[in-house]
Design a protein with these regions (language model features):
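Short glycine/proline- and aromatic-enriched beta-strand/turn motifs that initiate or cap beta-hairpins
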Residues: 10-67, 130
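Residues that define the transmembrane beta-barrel architecture of outer-membrane proteins
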Residues: 15-17, 39-43, 72-76, 90, ...
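Transmembrane beta-strands of outer-membrane beta-barrel pores
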Residues: 25-31, 61-65, 84, 98-102, ...
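Outer-membrane beta-barrel translocator domains and adjoining extracellular loop/strand segments
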Residues: 31-38, 67-74, 104-111, 137-145, ...
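Outer-membrane beta-barrel architecture
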Residues: 46-48, 79-81, 95, 116-118, ...
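Repeated loop/turn-to-beta-strand initiation elements of outer-membrane beta-barrel proteins
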Residues: 53-59, 88-94, 123-129, 158, ...
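Detector for outer-membrane/organellar transmembrane beta-barrel domains
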Residues: 108-179, 208
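Outer-membrane beta-barrel "beta-signal"
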Residues: 158, 193-202, 208, 222-236
Length: 236
């Protein structure tokens, strides 16, 4: 009896979990104002599990341009979080994620961890604040050090027709810095606007992306300024 109880608990947990995810292909892997695919297409996938109480965990992966730092052909990320329903319209989310560059050819790791808090209205508008305690700091294509970074951003989508949305987002990335000159604290803004169409689990996004030139001072990736990108995804 003492052995059977843990198995029963595990089985009960398994029946309570709900699973989901998506598979996507994008013409340009743009994230926070820079392109990690060097303007080329990327394949991406996500798989996650949710509990009835609001806890979720999952994994996400994307191909990327191997010639860019740190010499990895793809990104891999695991995450854990909890969603709090504040009312019928509002919810808050706390989450943590760990980002990896498997198979990187450079000798020094660019892996990092991130903590985030988000507030969402009707799953249509979200504002979030994130902290990266060990963010890697670059000066163009030269790796300098690690220093804490903060990110504030907002995203939204507005229904304008059956399955048709206007989309948009804006954010600001701030590196705390570790000294003077090229090591000084700095930051940059980024944003996007576009349209999206959803039907039967499929979604098509087309967006126009902007980013301040200061992004090139912090990341060894091409700037995604005045760029158009499209993504096709299937959600299950």
């Amino acid at each position: 009896m003492g052995v059977a109880a843990p198995h029963a608990a595990a089985a009960a947990l398994g029946t309570e979990l709900s699973w989901g995810g998506n598979i996507a292909i994008t013409s340009n892997y743009i994230y926070r104002g820079v392109s990690e695919s060097d303007g080329r297409a990327a394949l991406q996938a996500d798989l996650h599990a949710n509990t009835p109480g609001g806890t979720f965990a999952g994994a996400w992966a994307s191909t990327r341009e191997r010639s860019l730092e740190p010499g990895a052909g793809y990104d891999f990320e695991i995450y854990l979080g909890h969603r709090f329903d504040l009312s019928s319209a509002w919810n808050a989310t706390l989450s943590a994620r760990s980002h990896y560059f498997p198979g990187a050819t450079e000798g020094t790791s660019d892996d990092f961890q991130e903590l985030s808090a988000a507030l969402t209205w009707l799953d249509r508008w979200t504002v979030s604040v994130s902290a990266i305690p060990n963010a890697v700091r670059y000066w163009y294509y030269t790796r300098l050090s690690r220093s804490p970074a903060w990110i504030a951003d907002t995203t939204g989508q507005w229904l304008i027709g059956e399955g048709l949305f206007l989309t948009g987002g804006a954010g600001y990335y701030r590196s705390s810095g570790t000294g003077a000159g090229r090591l000084a604290a700095t930051g940059y803004g980024y944003g996007n606007a576009g349209v999206a169409f959803e039907r039967r689990g499929w979604r098509v996004d087309v967006g126009y992306f902007l980013a301040a030139t200061q992004a090139q001072e912090l990341f060894p990736y091409p700037l995604a300024n005045h760029r158009v990108a499209g993504t096709v995804s299937w959600h299950f």
